[in-house]
Amino acid sequence: MQVEVKLKENAYKVYIDELEELEFDTKVFILSNPKISGLHLKTLLSKIKAKEISIATVKDGEEYKNLSTMEEILSQMFNSKLDRKSVLISFGGGVISDMGGFAASIYQRGIDFINIPTTLLACVDAAVGGKTGVNNNFGKNLIGTFYQPKAVYCESSFLKTLSSRELAAGMAEFIKMAAIFDDSMLDFIEKIDEKSFLNATCENEIFTQIIAKSIELKARVVEQDEKESGLRMLLNYGHTFAHVIENFTDYKLYLHGEAVAIGMVMANQLALNLGLLDKMQSQRIKDILLKFGLPISYKINSVDEFYEAFFMDKKSSNKKINFVLASPLGKGLIKGDISKEDIITTLREFQ
């Protein structure tokens, strides 16, 4: 199956379960992590024909998604003597996808790259859309670029080796899309047998459907708003809170999808307090998150510090915090006129 991301410039296709043979008449640089290399690199290498292939592995995890690791990646790219016609392949989860895309965008002012995501989270979100970047002490993804891949290959077979925790984290991003764009997808999610899904014993078709539904939706959004000036901001539902949580826990306590799950609960509580969402809908999201073993609570130590951290969010401007809220489920809105008092009231409910 193929989904085209129809951008004015740099249009590309996402191939779902169609990774057969990749031929290049140039050098190829594969960026991965030790775990994915051990599990799947042999399979990938059997499908690639190129003048020369270089492989670099970096530590996995959001805590390593920083400028220090980026320097390592770039050094290995220079040592591999890549030129402007070389191709970088990001082979891993969201962290690898973000860093690989960023490295490709700045190496000699830009080389082509291909995403081959190996986690559900990367398939449904990180690998498509052209957002690249790294974290720093001030927050998540604050250093980065918009840089589109030449192609994306999502293989459901790679997902079979994921842990239940990683699968649940990917599901959180799918729930996010459903809650903000299409509540009929929530019906689909509620019908999934969570046991076989979390054990990765479900039919490949389930993974394929989740990936296809997500990518089709995200592709339409990115086509209308590639640089996140309006509609695309809705994809950040749950993320305004999640990014603060991740930063405050040094990116070590939660997987990104887990932080997003908590962020959605917080965003829904804010919407509930503002009369934009009813209690039944808020509870529905909690129930779906719990169904997949995702966290729904976080203890805020300092409400004032948490509030101030919002202003490092990329969606904020002129001392105004733009919150993405569901109102109702299946329809998102961006609200930038919420008083400090209302925000603080919601945050206090998580102390």
UniProtKB/Swiss-Prot annotation:
GO molecular-function terms, A-Z: 3-dehydroquinate synthase activity; metal ion binding; nucleotide binding
EC number: 4.2.3.4
Binding-site positions, NAD(+): 60-65, 94-98, 118-119, 131, 140, 158-161
Keywords, ordered alphabetically: Amino-acid biosynthesis, Aromatic amino acid biosynthesis, Cobalt, Cytoplasm, Lyase, Metal-binding, NAD, Nucleotide-binding, Zinc
InterPro entries per UniProt: Dehydroquinate_synthase, DHQ_synth_AroB, DHQ_synth_fam, DHQS/DOIS_N, DHQS_C
Gene3D superfamilies reported for this sequence: 3.40.50.1970, Dehydroquinate synthase-like - alpha domain (1.20.1090.10)
Pathway of action: Metabolic intermediate biosynthesis; chorismate biosynthesis; chorismate from D-erythrose 4-phosphate and phosphoenolpyruvate: step 2/7
Cofactor binding description: Binds 1 divalent metal cation per subunit. Can use either Co(2+) or Zn(2+).
Residues at which Zn(2+) binds: 173, 239, 256
Pfam families: DHQ_synthase, DHQS_C
Presence of the UniProt keyword NAD in the record: yes
PANTHER family hit by this protein: 3-DEHYDROQUINATE SYNTHASE, 3-DEHYDROQUINATE SYNTHASE, CHLOROPLASTIC
HAMAP family: DHQ_synthase
Function per UniProt: Catalyzes the conversion of 3-deoxy-D-arabino-heptulosonate 7-phosphate (DAHP) to dehydroquinate (DHQ).
Name used for this protein in its record: 3-dehydroquinate synthase
Organism: Campylobacter jejuni subsp. doylei (strain ATCC BAA-1458 / RM4099 / 269.97)
